[in-house]
Amino acid sequence: MKKDAIHPAVPYLIVPVGIVAVSTASLLIRFSQEYVPSIAIAAFRMGLAALILLPYTLIKHNREIKSLTWDVLKFTLLAGFLLAVHFASWITSLEYTSVASSVVLVTTTPLWVALLAPFFLGEKTPRIAFIGMTIALLGGIIIALSDVCVWLPGGINCQADFGNLGSKTLLGDFLALFGAVVAASYLMIGKHLRNKISLVPYIFLVFSASAIFLVAGMLISEGVPPLYPGKVYLWLLLLALVPQLLGHSIFNWSLKYLPTGYVAVNLLGEPVGSTILAYFFLNETPPAVKIIGAILILAGIGLGTFRQTSQKNEEIS
């Protein structure tokens, strides 16, 4: 399948919209977790997204879906399974660790993509991208530490006893990090599939497969869900519409035109977006340490992605 004829700048302009969209996820999840188990939140998120796409997909892309080969379908099922594991792991991590720590750890995805893509996709990563990712990840670490550190006139004072972290916090951190590894695998499979199937059928099939896996997991672990307050269904619907359909669809679409590492490193903007949205909608003013971390993340993204295609002479295999 040939790439559509679009202006080369369009994918680079659309990706920031995806960052804003996915940044709403942690807030909506936190609201929902007061009433809904984490795996059920993940199941609702993927199931609602798939149902919303169903009518349009059947009307506009029914013929393409019927013509898909088993080779494409089996990778689509694998992508759906990985997406289900990613969301189940990450959303559950928010029960045990802070939003900042969870989001920062799950956005280490670019590191895993950078490590794995040369072997599984044959892509070469520009040296400047590694430098940018390092700076951005440093900013992410600072944002995570801002939850346990205080900015004082004489410097930064961290009160946490890192030698005695509770098992729940460690579990949350591990689940978020595991979600990042799984997300990297999902992105690489998506890169492979996006050259063989158009966007809407791809995301519909992946979301549907993911929803089936998550619903099965929910029924096994939690049973049939009860009725929730009306506001909870609004949060779950927004979770499906904004970060899932809009945000992740943008990233899936961009994989057809942009290097996998570029798409993955832009996901590092999510902690920044989450902090900004919390400031406006939750009246949470970020401390100076968190602002410094946000600036580093933005700087790293800019450095790692600026004129990436002109860096071919500095590629690392």
Role assignments for model-derived ranges:
Residues 16, 71-76, 125-138, 197-206:
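Cytoplasmic-side transmembrane-helix entry/capping segments in multi-pass membrane proteins
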Residues 1-43, 81, 85, 89, ...:
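Glycine-/small-residue-enriched transmembrane alpha-helix faces in small-molecule transporters
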Residues 16-24, 28, 56, 77-96, ...:
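Hydrophobic alpha-helical transmembrane segments of multi-pass membrane transport proteins
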Residues 2-4, 46, 128, 145-146, ...:
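C-terminal-most transmembrane helix of multi-pass membrane proteins
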Residues 53, 77, 116, 125-161, ...:
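Hydrophobic transmembrane alpha-helices of multi-pass small-molecule transport proteins
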Residues 40-51, 91-124, 129, 140, ...:
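Specific alpha-helical transmembrane segments that line the substrate/conduction pathway
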Residues 32, 41, 45, 93, ...:
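Hydrophobic/aromatic residues within transmembrane alpha-helices
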Residues 23, 47-51, 137, 208-212, ...:
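Small-residue-rich packing faces within the transmembrane alpha-helices of Major Facilitator Superfamily
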